[in-house]
Regions:
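Membrane-proximal, glycine/serine-rich, low-complexity loop/turn segments characteristic
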Residues: 7-15, 40, 161, 166, ...
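Short connector loops at helix/strand junctions that flank enzyme active sites
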Residues: 78-82, 92-96, 143-147, 158
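Extracellular/periplasm-exposed beta-strand and loop segments of Gram-negative cell-envelope proteins
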Residues: 59-78, 106-144, 172-213, 217, ...
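Repeated loop/turn-to-beta-strand initiation elements of outer-membrane beta-barrel proteins
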Residues: 94-97, 159-161, 226-232
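Residues on the lipid-exposed face of transmembrane beta-strands in outer-membrane beta-barrel proteins
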Residues: 51-55, 81-89, 101-103, 148-154, ...
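Ligand-binding grooves and catalytic loops that recognize ribose/phosphate and carbohydrate rings
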Residues: 41, 250-252, 259-266
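Short glycine/proline- and aromatic-enriched beta-strand/turn motifs that initiate or cap beta-hairpins
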Residues: 6-87, 265
C-alpha cells in the first residue's frame, strides 16, 4: 500500500527511540493506538495488510460491438459490491507487490435491438428454436466470484500516491445469464432460414457460464487520512464469460469493470 516504505522508516525511528529513551511517542504515520509492536515489526520487514470494500461498475461486453447489435436502448449496471483483503510487500522504497483475496459480484441488465443475433430461445408454449433473432432482447447477467489479484506496485516520490498493475484470476461461485425476447422474429435454423414471428420467448444460458476467468487489473490508491486509503481500479477480462466452444452466442463477452472503494491499512 502507498507509503509502506515510509511507514517502515518511521517505525525504525520510533523503535530506536523507545529502546534508548523509553519514549513511546509515535510518528504521525503509526500513531494509532491499535498498532502494537508486532505490526511495527511487520512494517520493518516490508509487509502491510489492508481490508477494503467498494462498488463495481461495468458489464460483459463484446469487443468490438458486433453489427448484429443495432441499438442499446438501456443499460443497468446493477449493484455490484466487493470485499477484499490485501497483503503488501515492499522491495525498494518505490517498488513492491500486492497479493489480494476478493469476494465480488458482477452483473448488468441490458435492453437492445438486434438483427440476425444468433441465439436459442424457448417460446411460452415450450417450443425450442435456434437461429438469427431480429427484434428486442433483454439480458440479465449476475455472478459471484472469488478473485486473486497479483500486482506490481509503484509508490511515487509523494508517498500518498501509488499505482499498481498485474493479472487477476477468478473462480465463479454461482452465476446467472438469462433474459427474454419479444415482438420480433427469428430466422431458423440459421440467419438464412425461414422467418418465424415470436411474441415472447425466454432463454437461459446460466449453466454455460465459464467457471474460471482471468484478466488484467490496473489502478491506483491515494492515502487520504491516517490509515484510510481510496482505491480505483479497472479490471479487463481476457477470456469471455462463456467458454470458447459455446456457440449459441456467436461472439465473446468480456467482463470489463471499474471499481471504486476504500481500504484500511493496519
Amino acid at each position: 500500500m502507498t507509503g509502506v516504505s515510509a511507514q517502515a522508516a518511521d517505525a525504525t525511528t520510533w523503535l530506536e527511540s523507545t529502546e534508548t529513551t523509553g519514549n513511546a511517542d509515535r510518528p504521525d504515520t503509526i500513531r494509532d493506538s491499535s498498532n502494537d509492536r508486532n505490526i511495527i515489526l511487520a512494517a520493518l520487514k516490508g509487509w502491510q495488510v489492508a481490508v477494503g470494500a467498494g462498488l463495481e461498475l461495468g458489464g460483459a461486453s463484446p469487443v468490438p460491438i458486433p453489427r448484429s447489435i443495432r441499438k442499446i436502448n438501456s443499460f443497468n449496471p446493477l449493484l455490484n459490491l466487493y470485499l477484499e483483503g490485501t497483503a503488501y510487500k515492499s522491495f525498494t522504497p518505490r517498488w513492491g507487490m500486492a497479493l489480494g483475496l476478493r469476494f465480488e459480484t458482477k452483473g448488468m441488465k441490458t435492453n437492445a435491438n438486434v438483427k440476425n443475433y444468433h441465439m436459442a430461445i424457448i417460446e411460452d408454449d415450450g417450443g425450442h428454436m435456434e437461429g438469427g433473432w431480429n427484434g428486442p432482447v433483454i439480458t440479465k447477467y449476475r455472478a459471484t466470484y472469488i478473485t486473486v489479484p497479483v500486482l506490481a506496485t509503484y509508490t511515487f516520490s509523494n508517498p500518498r500516491w501509488m499505482v499498481s498493475a498485474g493479472p487477476y484470476f477468478s473462480l465463479m461461485l454461482n452465476g446467472d445469464f438469462d433474459g427474454y425476447v419479444h415482438d420480433g422474429y427469428i430466422r431458423t435454423p440459421d440467419e438464412l432460414g425461414e422467418n418465424v414471428n415470436v411474441t415472447h420467448a425466454t432463454y437461459d444460458f446460466s449453466n454455460n457460464l465459464r467457471k474460471f476467468q482471468w484478466g488484467l487489473q490496473v489502478g491506483g490508491s491515494f492515502h487520504a487520512y491516517k490509515h484510510l486509503y481510496v482505491n480505483a481500479n479497472l479490471d479487463w477480462g481476457l477470456n469471455g464469460i462463456f467458454p470458447s466452444d459455446f456457440k449459441t452466442i456467436s461472439f465473446a463477452l468480456y467482463p470489463i469493470y471499474g471499481t471504486l472503494g476504500f481500504s484500511y491499512l493496519f
